[in-house]
Amino acid sequence: MAALIDTGIFFGFYSLKDVHHMDSVAIVVHAVEGKWGRLFVTNHILDETLTLLKYKKLPADKFLEGFVESGVLNIIYTDDEVERKALEVFKARVYEKGFSYTDAISEVVAEELKLKLISYDSRFSLPTIGRDYWKSLDESERKRISAILREKGIDG
């Protein structure tokens, strides 16, 4: 089992004001604990995440240290075949509001490698894990995750 994690999860994790902050915190805790097996991002998601965090003045350096350099995330560098398939997916959906080339890459990679897709993006044609994740947890699990945040000195 393995999962591809989309940019919005990391943005929500670092952005305390984001509507999905607690969803992201719970997803990251469960992901790091191994709930979905090996964790992946594509080089496109990595680019998008680093750029967004830096642009929004959020800790891109902490993301690099905590997720990339630590080995928590495995990076999938897309090859020509994946890029060509993603271009076709993107072309077919070019007028769909909010659907990006990075989304097309993610969809192709998740489908080909049979990865769970962890994202808040409802435009994917594949099922996703993400929206209302925090609400789906029972009270004891929410308390456990909140205790982890307090222990680490993180607002939640």
UniProtKB/Swiss-Prot annotation:
Top EC class for this record: hydrolase
Molecular function as annotated in GO: magnesium ion binding; RNA endonuclease activity
BP terms from Gene Ontology: rRNA catabolic process
Cofactor(s) needed by this chain: Mg(2+)
Function: Toxic component of a type II toxin-antitoxin (TA) system. An RNase.
Keyword Nuclease tagged: yes
InterPro entries: PIN-like_dom_sf, PIN_dom, VapC20-like, VapC_family
Keyword Membrane part of the UniProt annotation: no
Domain of life: Archaea
Lineage: Archaea, Methanobacteriati, Methanobacteriota, Archaeoglobi, Archaeoglobales
Entry EC no(s): 3.1.-.-
Binding site for Mg(2+): D6, D103
Residue ranges of domain PINc in the record: 4-125
Official protein name in the record: VapC ribonuclease AF_1683
Pfam family, one: PIN
Keywords: Hydrolase, Magnesium, Metal-binding, Nuclease, Toxin-antitoxin system
UniProt source species: Archaeoglobus fulgidus (strain ATCC 49558 / DSM 4304 / JCM 9628 / NBRC 100126 / VC-16)
Family recorded in the similarity comment: Belongs to the PINc/VapC protein family.
